[in-house]
């Protein structure tokens, strides 16, 4: 049988099962309300398993503990069914002595995936399993589509992403990944608020896309009759708030970048950005190390983070190395003279595979070389510092070397996880850098920034010395859950429509 014939046979089988389940639903409708909403549970499956884990069969029988549970049927073995709620699973026992004939007849028609409500008392089987000996049970929701085969699950990766709701039903590991994601975000929020940061919300629709070097999504505001952009970063609005007197702010929200899709990139992604006045980028490095250690300990119970065949050590001091020095360290065949000669640097960048357009300055070329020859080699946590000013239009120049900025990017496993710098608060310097970005855009750089006159005006009122940082939540969760693709940690990643 060919793959096409097999697919057709499986589809026909599924269609027949759906038709049978629809007949059962029609019978439920004929009885009255087929989708009741008057049941209130008083227990979760996992809580019961934990609370009564040490109770013996005899102790449970004597206590006769009443419970109300609800969940989806995941296994049906006649006398015993296994139901699943958001916390876990528990068995329920179909007791012919305590259930009515009508109920027993109804139970026989139920299918895997149906959602039921059960009342009864806790008991323990001869094998030691906790279960609910039901005194009443009823159907709450009829499932019309059969779940994937229990032995094989939902294994097609694309279908898992397209039908995440099914993926979540049948795969506990997937549910745990998204529980961890929620934990991570909650802890980040708590971590910052304990340090007097104020959570804020800034516009998702912007008239000028700014705060990052990226290509935006464009849209049209009908009421105002104007072009607008989905934000690529909230940075410029958050710094306006620092100007306004909110000296410590953060936002956890979506950014949108109209760029490629890969295991590390999704056009819609979640970012933490935070800003604190009277601090610099080195303060942010210390804060970031502390946060990452806490998150690893919270999720894994250890500061050693396994990822694939590697282990990242969050408990050790993160390496701190400049862009320039990192190129020389990981490429000993290159010299400082090579990197400081624009013609040689251009040739090295081209040979390494960078897309050199011809208008790049020396600093831009050095970063291109770093991205091609160094980035993927940074396995253990590295703070890469002192990015050239021409690729850091919003960062403060370094006091000792004005050709570079007080900036770092954090790399773990060869991936950028965070980007931070001491913020540029010189309004005149900012205006000049915006003009340089406009020139780059005119020369063909789609990712160069626009000129934002209102942001320059805000700086003219005076912004205190400030440090800011952005951390990619999705990539961070990938690390902490050992997930190989960014799509594994986004509930509904972007997919092409099915034909």
UniProtKB/Swiss-Prot annotation:
Reaction catalyzed: tRNA(Lys) + L-lysine + ATP = L-lysyl-tRNA(Lys) + AMP + diphosphate
InterPro entries on file: Aa-tRNA-synt_II, aa-tRNA-synth_II, aa-tRNA-synth_II/BPL/LPL, Lys-tRNA-ligase_II, Lys-tRNA-ligase_II_N, Lys-tRNA-synth_II_C, NA-bd_OB-fold, NA-bd_OB_tRNA
Family annotation (CDD domains): LysRS_core, LysRS_N
PROSITE patterns: AA_TRNA_LIGASE_II
Note on cofactor: Binds 3 Mg(2+) ions per subunit.
Residues that bind Mg(2+) 1: 409, 416
Residues involved in Mg(2+) 2 binding: 416
UniProt xrefs under PANTHER family: LYSINE--TRNA LIGASE, CHLOROPLASTIC_MITOCHONDRIAL, LYSYL-TRNA SYNTHETASE
Name of this chain's protein: Lysine--tRNA ligase
Organism of provenance: Pseudomonas fluorescens (strain Pf0-1)
Organism taxonomic ancestry: Bacteria, Pseudomonadati, Pseudomonadota, Gammaproteobacteria, Pseudomonadales
Gene that this sequence comes from: lysS
